[in-house]
Regions:
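Noncatalytic partner-interaction/assembly domains of nucleic-acid and motor enzyme complexes
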Residues: 1-53
Length: 53
């Protein structure tokens, strides 16, 4: 996948928790090609699931 697309997706789910709810069943960290984007995704996922953002 394109790094820019990965970053756009991360930005979308970070700014809109409902976007995460729509993709959480089929998207996981392995979807991301960049290691840093995988870590960012896991962090966002943890924050959203724990109602911290």
């Amino acid at each position: 996948m394109n790094i820019g697309a990965e970053q756009a997706l991360l930005g979308a789910i970070l700014s809109n928790n409902q976007a995460f709810e729509k993709i959480e069943d089929f998207l996981d960290a392995d979807f991301f090609s960049s290691k840093i984007n995988k870590l960012i995704f896991e962090s966002i996922k943890k924050l959203i699931t724990n109602d911290q953002i």
